[in-house]
């Protein structure tokens, strides 16, 4: 930019130093200052100041004496430098003063404002109830605020009820930015306020956002009505912005010419006191709809429909007429699909698509056709279903017109026999080609009734001359088709002569809703040609309708080979429905009403029939004769392939079945579609792989001579020491990674004799670097395999010399013997051993011998396999020639079997223990090495945490000791998640406690660690709604209270809202005569609030001991006592109480139930509870992502040592959980609800010598026997909130 100014400003300066001496250098600065102060792209002016100073100092002189010429030169320079054609410098010596400004609106009367506005405003109602509004100047906010009521009453109300609106801006060259919201708001759908533009004003250096008005006086234009904006090449400024905004909002269709591409505010400013003026855009749009995208300024608004401005209104009315018809078009289209479309199962999806289709962008018939066809064919996947534009002569007269049958009647057959013979001769061309090949050509299809009449003549003149031919070529290249009624009859002549009726195809006709099966006819004039002789159909792009049907069905049935061009794809059995009729034509739907379904269940959806051999039509006959010659050897090739499989394939158990299937497919004509060795090889490969499930079976065509398979391999060549050193460096990569982790990569498997020959050098140059590492990574990701004879030697290095290990077994098809492969007793160099970790990296590229090594190491659990599933190669592959042809079969000749299971290795290859992309396999292996190094420490830490914190100290110490002895079980752990799963299983087996858990929680999930992350405490205001939602209360029949809550809260948390609990929960049930507490869905929680909850169900007086809790971490026993003071009124001990339980009842809910049952205060009805535990604690294990959840406390209140942990609370009345509430209500209704105070409670109060342990009476009132171990002294209570702690 600096360089541009440096070139431009010398021109300015030099031009101002002409002989007239009227121009001073200061004028350059003034002109530049006008730009700096007013140009709306100030960022484009960076560097101008320095360029000006440099230009002023320049002594170059450009002698332009004419100021008009100078103005033109300066304009071209400025526009070129700033790339803005709106910048214009003009010389106007006659303009002595600035043009007078229009009087301010505030100084005009209302009548003057209205008169001025009416000059540029016209409105009328056009034909078809289309509103027309022409605006030649956009008034500003001051005018609109004064005249809005007038405009609404006299203009808008006449237009708002029209069915569509045309807004004519063709003559609008400007206006006020402040008027934009008024225009947009009345056309903007909805009641929301929208940001439609942002305007930057350079003189004030301010940015103003333009929003639609929050309230519009009068009614807005309905969103479902179309709006069209007319534009011309003169439309400029604010009018362009309005057109662009409405187009971007998809609220209007712009019709006409591209607009001028002006500016929102273009001003002509005098340069200093000179006669030069600079026209400059002082404000700009920063992006319609606030998106900041490229706007219309400088380029103009591109119309949706381009047309000359003078024709824009006419074109707009045509667009509106089309859009008014759209709902009817869619409705007629949906009706036609429901009534006629043959693929009924696809109709609902089509109807749904049409109902949801967005047609807002449709402005022409071509647009509509394109959009409808794209949608219909994408959803239906049926190319036959399409909408077309039709001209008047093509337009359908109605839904009755269809292409299903020709309108003309069946022609009458002449009675004269000579004429009939001549007619047959004219239609059919018959000859016998060399090689006894029949040739039959006919160029049209007749109706079945015509063929029936002419049958004897056709038999004698056409069919009998072809009966004794060896093959038949049927020429349909010039056949445009005709009625399809004769197709089943023609097909019948190609069935086997002695066969019963054959199902040829079926058809479904939507009009009759009938599926019809078509069978071959057995009673024919003459003998069928049969299926054993070759039939070849010649086709071209002119082959159509019934001729296409015949070609398709002959190919589908496997009775013919097609040669030639793809057929026309012109089908019968369609129906034409008129969707729209206009004077220029209209739209019509072509809908298929009948579907062909072949014997494979495939529907033919039209389109051309693709030949088996595609050639030009004029070459089809020659090509068919070539294919015929190839097919003479087809049987021998297929059967020869089967014989090779029987002799050499390594899986004899499937060979017999594969041979039978090949012969069956050959007899069925399945290989008639093969037209050369290449296509036959492809088809045989696909069939063999599908039959066997073995992707290693290949048949291929090789025109060149292949090396004989039996040729003995050359003896291994032992390289020189120099060559060997170079080869080892190139083929082997070794490295010792941090942590004494060895890394070995080699990308090929050498033959055993070669390995033995260079063994000492390999040991010295490769193996010695790795043998003393702590663990080893063997990288086979890039190893395609090759020789497998060296695999046992490689495996032997990773096992001890004795005892020898059985690696795998090999079944050899040639000898039918199974050979066991074992480790070698002696190897060169030191063994790696069997105790150090081994990791094998594999990928999709790893094959044959590399897979054998990975399979063996995985099968014997000697290595961890990491990477991608391997290729699934073979130990040995044989390639055999099929007869003397250029066809070859490649197949595995040996099969490897697992040493541990005796089963053959999976044909799909090696499935890794850890499946990851090959690119991260090495880093995954290193992570596992690091993890396994941590395992001893992790087990030690876990044992110590259990010993120090488990609720049963003796069992915790025992578990820690036994856990250390299980370290070998963790030798093959591959992830922290697997380690957590294994550790949890061991701990639960050792303890018998399912609540002792291990979790793997990654760093990004730390917020879900139980007991580690504190729960956020909501505000008391939020708590009120939370309480209403969490607690369910009711008063049942007989004044029986009902209370359900599904989780216990923390004591400290509930203390803050005790008054809310009393107000919204407790007061609703405290005055009932009996209470049902529903714990069936309560999953527990903190136990700190149990003392307070229990206290409400005992009378005020000396505290009662509820339970004793042993806490292992601090090795202490705490006592739970009732509280002496509570928030709200007590329920007391005299009223009946029932607790409902289920197998879901857990944790704190079990503790509460256990206490109330043991003290005889409540009757428990339902199911045995889950047998949970006191709230456990979670501990982090070292620097891993493992967390141990350990039950650290247990109830020890019972004298006999029993508790509910692990076994659950047994109900007094056992019933299914869903029946518990009903049973409780029944028992409460048949029992007196008041009872005298139980003597047991008197005996359990503070200060009594005898204390009682009671049992629940029939309804949970205290009835007791003496139990001296329960009552002890309690500390004096203090006032607590509801559900507060002691």
From Swiss-Prot:
CDD domains: Peptidase_S41_IRBP (cd07563). Its main location: secreted. Residues 18-22 form a propeptide. Residues 23-1231 are annotated as: 4 X approximate tandem repeats. Keywords: Extracellular matrix, Glycoprotein, Repeat, Secreted, Signal, Transport, Vitamin A. One of its GO terms (molecular function) is serine-type peptidase activity. Gene3D superfamilies: 2-enoyl-CoA Hydratase, Chain A, domain 1, 3.30.750.44. InterPro entries: ClpP/crotonase-like_dom_sf (IPR029045), Tail-specific_protease (IPR005151). Pfam families: Peptidase_S41 (PF03572), Peptidase_S41_N (PF11918). One of its GO terms (cellular component) is cone matrix sheath. Residues 1-17 form the signal peptide. It is found in: Secreted, Extracellular space, Extracellular matrix, Interphotoreceptor matrix. It comes from the Eukaryota. One of its GO terms (biological process) is proteolysis. SUPFAM superfamilies: ClpP/crotonase. Glycans are attached at residues 107, 161, 205, 513, 1114. The keyword Secreted applies. Residues 1233-1252 have a biased composition (Basic residues). Residues 389-415, 1227-1286 are annotated as: Disordered. Sequence repeats lie at residues 23-323, 324-631, 632-932, 933-1231. Belongs to the peptidase S41A family. IRBP shuttles 11-cis and all trans retinoids between the retinol isomerase in the pigment epithelium and the visual pigments in the photoreceptor cells of the retina. This is Retinol-binding protein 3. It comes from Bos taurus (Bovine).
């Amino acid at each position: 930019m600096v360089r541009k100014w440096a070139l431009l400003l010398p021109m300015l300066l030099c031009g101002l130093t002409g002989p007239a001496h009227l121009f001073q250098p200061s004028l350059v600065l003034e002109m530049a200052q006008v730009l700096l102060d007013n140009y709306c792209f100030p960022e484009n002016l960076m560097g101008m100041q320095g360029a000006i100073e440099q230009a002023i100092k320049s002594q170059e002189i450009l002698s332009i004496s004419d100021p008009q010429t100078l103005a033109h030169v300066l304009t071209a320079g400025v526009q070129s430098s700033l790339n803005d054609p709106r910048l214009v410098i003009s010389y106007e010596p006659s303009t002595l003063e600035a043009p007078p400004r229009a009087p301010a609106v505030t100084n005009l009367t209302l009548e003057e404002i209205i008169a001025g506005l009416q000059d540029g405003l016209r409105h009328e109602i056009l034909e078809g109830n289309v509103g027309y509004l022409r605006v030649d100047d956009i008034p500003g906010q001051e005018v609109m605020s004064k005249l809005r009521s007038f405009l609404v009453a006299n203009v808008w109300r006449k237009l708002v009820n029209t069915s569509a609106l045309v807004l004519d801006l063709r003559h609008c060259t400007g206006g006020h930015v402040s008027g934009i919201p008024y225009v947009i708001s009345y056309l903007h759908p909805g009641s929301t306020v929208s940001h439609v533009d942002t305007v930057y004003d350079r003189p004030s250096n301010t940015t103003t956002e333009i929003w639609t008005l929050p309230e519009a006086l009068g009614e807005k234009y309905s969103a479902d009505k179309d709006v069209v904006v007319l534009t011309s090449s003169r439309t400029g400024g604010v009018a362009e912005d309005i057109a662009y905004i409405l187009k971007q909002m998809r609220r209007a269709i712009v019709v006409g010419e591209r607009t001028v591409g002006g500016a929102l505010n273009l001003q002509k400013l005098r340069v200093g006191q000179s006669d030069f003026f600079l026209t400059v855009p002082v404000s700009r749009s920063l992006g319609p709809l606030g998106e900041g995208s490229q706007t219309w300024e400088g380029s103009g608004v591109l119309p949706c429909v381009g047309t000359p401005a003078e024709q824009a209104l006419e074109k707009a009315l045509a667009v509106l007429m089309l859009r008014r018809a759209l709902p009817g078009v869619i409705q007629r289209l949906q009706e036609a699909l429901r009534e006629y479309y043959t693929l009924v199962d696809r109709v609902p999806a089509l109807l749904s698509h049409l109902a949801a289709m967005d047609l807002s962008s449709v402005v022409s018939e071509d647009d509509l056709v394109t959009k409808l066809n794209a949608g219909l064919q994408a959803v239906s996947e049926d190319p036959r279903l399409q909408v077309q534009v039709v001209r008047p002569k093509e337009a359908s007269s109605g839904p009755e017109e269809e292409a299903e049958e020709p309108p003309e009647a069946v022609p009458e057959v002449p009675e004269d026999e000579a004429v009939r013979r001549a007619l047959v001769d004219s239609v059919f061309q018959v000859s016998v080609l060399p090689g006894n090949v029949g040739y039959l050509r006919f160029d049209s299809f007749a109706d079945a009734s015509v063929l029936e009449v002419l049958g004897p003549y056709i038999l004698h003149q056409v069919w009998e001359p072809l009966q004794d031919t060896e093959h038949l070529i049927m020429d349909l290249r010039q056949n445009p088709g005709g009625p399809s009624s004769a197709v089943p009859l023609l097909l019948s002549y190609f069935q086997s002569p002695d066969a019963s009726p054959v199902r040829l195809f079926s058809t479904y006709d939507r009009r009759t809703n009938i599926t019809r099966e078509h069978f071959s006819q057995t009673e024919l004039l003459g003998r069928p040609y049969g299926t054993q002789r070759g039939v070849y159909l010649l086709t071209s792009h002119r082959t159509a309708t019934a001729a296409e049907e015949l070609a398709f069905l002959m190919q589908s049935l496997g009775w013919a080979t097609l040669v030639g061009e793809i057929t026309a794809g012109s089908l019968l059995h369609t129906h034409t429905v008129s969707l729209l009729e206009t004077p220029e034509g209209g739209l019509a739907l072509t809908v298929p009403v009948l579907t062909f379904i072949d014997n494979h269940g495939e529907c033919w959806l039209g389109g051309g029939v693709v030949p088996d051999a595609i050639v030009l039509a004029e070459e089809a006959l020659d090509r068919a004769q070539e294919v015929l010659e190839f097919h003479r050897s087809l049987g021998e090739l297929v059967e020869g392939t089967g014989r090779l499989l029987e002799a050499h394939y390594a899986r004899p158990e499937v060979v017999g079945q594969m041979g039978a299937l090949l012969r069956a497919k050959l007899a069925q004509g399945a290989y008639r579609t093969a037209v050369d060795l290449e296509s036959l090889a492809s088809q045989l490969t696909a069939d063999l792989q599908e039959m066997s499930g073995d992707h290693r079976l290949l048949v291929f065509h090789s025109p060149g001579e292949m090396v004989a398979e039996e040729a003995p391999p050359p003896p291994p060549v032992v390289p020189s020491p120099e060559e060997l050193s170079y080869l080892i460096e190139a083929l082997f990569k070794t490295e010792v990674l941090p942590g004494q982790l060895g890394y070995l990569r080699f990308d090929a498997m050498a033959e055993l004799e070669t390995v033995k020959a260079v063994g000492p050098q390999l040991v010295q140059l490769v193996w010695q670097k790795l043998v003393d590492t702590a663990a080893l990574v063997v990288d086979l990701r890039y190893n395609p395999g090759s020789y497998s004879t060296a695999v046992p030697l490689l495996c032997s290095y990773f096992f001890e010399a004795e005892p020898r290990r059985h690696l795998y077994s090999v079944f050899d098809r040639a000898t039918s013997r199974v050979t066991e492969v074992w480790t070698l007793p002696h190897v060169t160099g030191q063994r790696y051993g069997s105790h150090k970790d081994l990791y094998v990296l594999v990928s999709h590229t790893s094959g044959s011998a590399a897979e054998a090594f990975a399979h063996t190491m995985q099968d014997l659990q000697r290595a961890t396999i990491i990477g991608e599933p391997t290729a699934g190669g073979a130990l040995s592959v044989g390639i055999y020639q099929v007869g003397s042809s250029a066809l070859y079969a490649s197949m595995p000749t040996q099969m490897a079997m697992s040493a541990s299971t005796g089963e053959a290795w999976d044909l799909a290859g090696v499935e890794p223990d850890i499946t990851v992309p090959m690119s991260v396999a090495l880093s995954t292996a290193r992570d596992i090495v690091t993890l396994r190094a941590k395992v001893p420490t992790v087990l030690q830490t876990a044992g110590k945490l259990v010993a120090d914190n488990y609720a049963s100290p003796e069992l915790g110490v025992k578990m820690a000791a036994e856990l250390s002895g299980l370290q070998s079980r963790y030798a093959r752990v591959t992830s922290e998640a697997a380690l957590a799963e294994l550790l949890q299983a061991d701990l639960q087996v050792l303890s018998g406690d399912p609540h002792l858990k291990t979790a793997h929680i990654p760093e990004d999930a730390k917020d879900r660690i139980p007991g580690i992350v504190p729960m956020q405490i909501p505000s008391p205001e939020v708590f009120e709604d939370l309480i209403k939602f969490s607690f369910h209360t009711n008063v049942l029949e007989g004044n029986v209270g009902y209370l359900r809550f599904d989780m216990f809260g923390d004591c400290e948390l509930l203390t803050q809202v005790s008054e809310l609990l009393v107000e919204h929960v407790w007061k609703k049930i405290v005055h009932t005569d009996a209470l049902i507490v529903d714990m069936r869905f309560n999953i527990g929680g903190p136990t700190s609030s149990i003392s307070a909850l229990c206290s409400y169900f005992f009378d005020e007086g000396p505290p009662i001991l509820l339970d004793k809790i042993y806490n292992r971490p601090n090795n202490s026993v705490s006592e739970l006592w009732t509280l002496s003071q509570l928030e709200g009124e007590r329920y007391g001990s005299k009223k009946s109480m029932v607790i409902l339980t289920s197998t879901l009842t857990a944790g704190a809910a079990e503790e509460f139930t256990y206490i109330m049952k043991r003290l005889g205060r409540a009757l428990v009805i339902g199911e045995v509870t889950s047998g949970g535990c006191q709230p456990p604690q979670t501990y982090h294990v070292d620097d891993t992502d493992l967390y141990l959840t350990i039950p650290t406390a247990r109830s020890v209140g019972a004298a006999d040592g029993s508790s509910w942990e692990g076994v659950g609370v047994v109900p007094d009345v056992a019933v299914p959980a869903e029946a518990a509430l009903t049973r409780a209500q029944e028992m409460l209704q048949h029992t007196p609800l008041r009872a005298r105070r139980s003597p047991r409670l008197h005996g359990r109060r503070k200060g009594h010598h005898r204390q009682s342990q009671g049992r629940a009476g029939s309804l949970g009132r205290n009835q007791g026997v003496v139990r001296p171990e329960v009552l002890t002294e309690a500390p004096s209570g203090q006032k607590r909130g509801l559900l507060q702690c002691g």
